[in-house]
From Swiss-Prot:
This is Uncharacterized protein Lmo1967. Belongs to the TelA family.
């Protein structure tokens, strides 16, 4: 337990750093739309735009206002600013994806599976048959110590119980860590939602600016150029067209980033659900299965002690019968009646076997869930690596 403290503290520190890194509001993500101080950019919709519904029409009224204000900051004359448009949100999304990948990589629940396997091994050490003592050989066990005595059996089960308690403590720590991970993932989910909303506003603002250029600015410039015949006026038309094309490509890149946030949401939930299912199974083992096992073993040991007492009483009766032959008939009758009475209440150990079998099935199901969770996380890790690489390629293409 002590050896795990440094690693646990390191993980907690990493979580705090990541939490601080992503502790930004939607307004923060929109505060610097072009990725640098004092710089603005411009955007435009391509003339060959599809008839797909505008993203701005899907926004809330508040977000529509933000998109409109942001579109006003886009200056068609500032060609260089296009490279930085939406870059802050994309950069944070890149860091977020990297954080998600790091989280999936460090979430190896293998130790939990090892702990559960250890628990199953300890439970299987408990042999219900050695608690039954149904035949007469039990008296030989008790008095001649040919086999285990009641004290040896009790000592064995006390040792197993202590080991199970230690395993239960480890499982409790593992469950706590899983729930802490889910809490951290919930924070990541909320931040992913913020990035999604910020990208929506960036894209919507770009759509609005493109629409303005296509429907108003370009027609006006073309009309002016046709009226004046000035080559510089025609150049302005060409510059604005080129600006619109670059902005349209930039908006497309932002749409790709937006798709990443859409895909990450169910992936986060998938990891959370797997953690929750595993934590629930651990809770079932700690709160139900282990106490039930202890209770049944305690009952079986108590009954075994009762059998020992019955055996001792019978031996006394038989010894007395040998020594007191003058009272043989009476002692014989008493011994038989006493034996009959004391033989009552011998426990049916089948119930204990069935209970232990159910417990082992529960643990096997837990291992199955753990294995499925590991496979799902491996798939999620591969997908996140692919998405991160795609994002890097997109960002490189923008340069």
């Amino acid at each position: 337990m002590t050896e795990n403290k440094p690693s646990e503290q390191t993980n907690e520190l990493k979580d705090l750093v990541v939490e601080k890194e992503f502790n930004q509001t939607l307004d923060d993500l929109l505060a610097n739309p072009f990725g640098s101080d004092g710089e603005s950019a411009a955007s435009i919709v391509n003339n060959e735009t599809d008839a797909a519904p505008r993203l701005v029409d899907m926004l809330t009224e508040t977000n529509k206002k933000q998109a409109l204000e942001l579109s006003k900051q886009i200056e068609p004359g500032n060609q260089a600013a296009i490279l930085g448009y939406g870059a802050p949100a994309q950069a944070k999304l890149h860091d977020f994806s990297h954080s998600m990948l790091a989280h999936v990589q460090k979430q190896d629940v293998g130790p939990i599976g090892d702990i559960i396997s250890d628990l199953m091994y300890r439970l299987q050490e408990a042999d219900p048959d050695e608690l039954a003592a149904r035949n007469k050989n039990v008296f030989t066990k008790m008095f001649h110590r040919v086999k285990q005595s009641i004290n040896e059996i009790t000592s064995k089960y006390q040792k197993i119980g202590t080991q199970i308690d230690r395993i239960a403590l480890k499982l409790e720590h593992s469950k706590k860590r899983l729930m802490e991970d889910n809490s951290f993932l919930e924070q990541l989910y909320d931040k992913n939602k913020d990035y999604f909303q910020a990208l929506n506003i960036y894209i919507a603002a770009g759509e609005l600016k493109l629409e303005e250029i296509n429907t108003k600015m370009l027609p006006e410039l073309r009309k002016k150029a046709e009226q004046t015949g000035d080559q510089m006026d025609y150049q302005e038309v060409n510059d604005l067209t080129q600006f619109a094309d670059r902005l349209d490509k930039r908006v497309y890149d932002l749409r790709l980033s937006r798709q990443i946030t859409i895909q990450q949401a169910p992936q986060i939930r998938l990891i959370q659900n797997t953690n929750q299912a595993l934590a629930e199974k651990i809770q079932s083992s700690i709160m139900t299965a282990i106490p039930l096992w202890k209770n049944q073993v305690a009952i079986a040991l108590t009954l075994l002690r009762q059998q020992q007492a019955v055996a001792a009483q019978r031996q006394v009766s038989e010894t007395t019968n040998e020594l007191l032959k003058r009272n043989a008939d009476m002692l014989k009758t008493n011994a038989i009646e006493t034996a009959r009475e004391n033989e009552r209440g011998i426990v049916d150990i089948e119930t204990l076997k069935e209970t232990q079998s159910s417990l082992i099935e529960t643990l096997q199901e837990t291992l199955k869930i753990q294995q499925e969770g590991r496979a799902k996380r491996a798939v999620a890790e591969k997908e996140l690596v692919t998405m991160e690489q795609e994002l890097k390629e997109r960002l490189l293409e923008m340069k």
